[in-house]
Design a protein with these regions (language model features):
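N-terminal "arm"/small-domain region of PLP-dependent enzymes with the aminotransferase-like
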Residues: 2-74, 78-79, 84-85, 367-370
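Conserved core of the PLP fold type I
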Residues: 59, 65-210, 221-243, 358, ...
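Walker B catalytic acidic pair
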Residues: 218
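Conserved core segment of the aminotransferase class I/II
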Residues: 237-318, 418
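Conserved glycine-rich beta-strand-loop-beta hairpin in the small C-terminal domain of fold type I
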Residues: 311-325, 337-352
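Conserved PLP-binding active-site segment of the aspartate aminotransferase-like
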Residues: 350-355, 372-414
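Short amphipathic alpha-helices in soluble, non-transmembrane regions
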Residues: 361-367, 405-410
Length: 423
């Protein structure tokens, strides 16, 4: 049944049917949440061993460094090496910090704003205007960071291979364009992997701004839930190859590997950037939580062992993602009112409805007790120009709750589409 081709009588019959289904869902008083990519209790239980990874004072010493004490601003050598092995860069290029990669990202932009970067002519706060490129749909918290500094956010359409590089390459001719957000693997929310060609074009860019900042958030670098680990290019060496070693800062964390909010995070950059940034960071901090870094090193051990843990996460996640996609295929695909990308990793399914349906769909879902990411959140300033993108986060609810939530969501999308196409 194609909703766009219904006769008036067919529309009324379908509308009455879907409306009745919606009212029955509302009557159940559900309280379900698909708003954020949180880990389920089952996933958190996988890493309970990290709580007892350190049990004696002797175990707190790592390569001669007592993790209980001050010092080692750039993090424990072993933690830096673990991240370097995962990211494919050098240990000397890694700064291991606290629990939040978002905080490290904010701090990097903040330092550019207040002090300037290595190749800045002046702090960005003294620039007449600062513009920032935002591949969209993208991560709402990225956009909020750059919006909070008053930057002008420019939407860059996403393709199946990553951001539209023709548009990017044209825009960076403007010296006021200072940077770009990226989630290169299993992008949030589309689950797209940047192609090798896209990565090469990004690495070889020649922005007019000498201090252009490529923010490379590799949040889902080892987060496959369908199939084996997919290797990825080391953006640091790619940029260095094209004379852009100082252009990029890469970020990662264990937030969806161990404990969200109690993991460890890092940034990776050129040695020259490392020297510049550690001088600034050394004013605000003496060291980060090395005890937690050491707990993670003891628990995760190395890249191979970490990938084995991610396979255990995948066993929990895959049935949930399969169920979401199967429900969409069964309930929505025949109606011609939405499309989606089926990801093999990451934490989201991105649904693109027919124009003008996202806000209404999510308002109906909220009334029926299903909370989801706000409409528009995946675009700069919270404004989706087509009002069509909806981010589904399947990871937190148990499967039985997720089945209910998806049934409600599909019902709401149908109702919104029928309202829009009223005969």
């Amino acid at each position: 049944m194609d909703y766009m081709a219904l006769s008036a009588a067919e529309w009324q019959q379908e509308y009455d049917k879907v409306s009745a289904e919606y009212e029955s869902w509302k009557a159940k008083g559900l309280k379900l949440n698909m708003a954020r990519g949180k880990l389920s209790k089952q996933q958190l239980d996988l890493v309970s061993g990290i709580l007892t990874a350190l049990t004696s004072a002797e175990e707190c010493v790592d390569s001669g460094v007592d993790a209980r004490n001050y010092g080692e601003l750039k993090g424990l050598e072993s933690a830096r090496k673990l991240f370097a092995d995962i990211l494919g860069c050098k240990t000397s290029q890694v700064f291991a910090g606290g629990n939040s990669s978002l905080q490290l990202m904010y701090d990097t932009v903040s330092k550019a704003y207040t002090h300037g970067l290595l190749h800045s002519e002046k702090p960005w706060c003294k620039e007449e205007s600062v513009k920032w490129l935002c591949p969209s749909p993208g991560y709402d918290r990225h956009f909020k960071v750059t919006e909070s500094f008053g930057f002008e956010l420019i939407t860059i359409p996403m393709t199946e291979n990553g951001p539209d590089m023709d548009i990017v390459e044209n825009l960076i001719k403007d010296p006021s364009v200072k940077g770009m957000w990226n989630v290169p693997k299993y992008s949030n929310p589309d689950g797209i992997i940047y192609s090798d060609e896209t990565i090469e074009r990004i690495a070889k860019m020649k922005p007019a701004a000498p201090d252009f900042l490529l923010m490379w958030d590799n949040a889902y670098c080892i987060h496959e839930f369908d199939g084996d680990f997919v290797p990825f290019k080391d953006i640091l060496s790619e940029c260095e190859k094209y004379g852009n070693a100082d252009m990029v800062f890469e970020f990662a964390s264990t937030s969806k590997v161990t404990l969200p909010g109690a993991g460890i995070a890092c940034f990776a950059c050129s040695e020259a950037n490392m020297e510049y940034m550690t001088k600034l960071i050394g004013i605000q901090a003496i060291s980060f939580d090395k005890m937690n870094q050491l707990r993670h090193v003891k628990f995760l051990q190395n890249k191979e062992h970490t990938l084995a843990l991610m396979k255990e996460h995948a066993k929990i996640l895959k049935p949930k993602f399969d169920m979401v996609v199967e429900t969409l295929e069964r309930e929505i695909k025949p109606l011609g009112i939405a499309s989606w990308h089926t990801p093999k990793g990451g934490y989201f399914v991105s649904v693109n409805t027919a124009p003008g349906l996202a806000k209404r769909t999510l308002a109906l879902a909220k009334e029926a007790g299903v909370v989801m990411t706000s409409a528009g959140a995946t675009y700069p300033y919270g404004h989706d120009p087509l009002d069509s993108n909806i981010r589904v986060a399947p990871s937190l609810p148990p499967v039985e709750e997720l089945e209910q939530a998806m049934a409600v969501f599909c019902c709401c999308l149908k109702l919104a589409a029928l309202e829009k196409s009223k005969k």
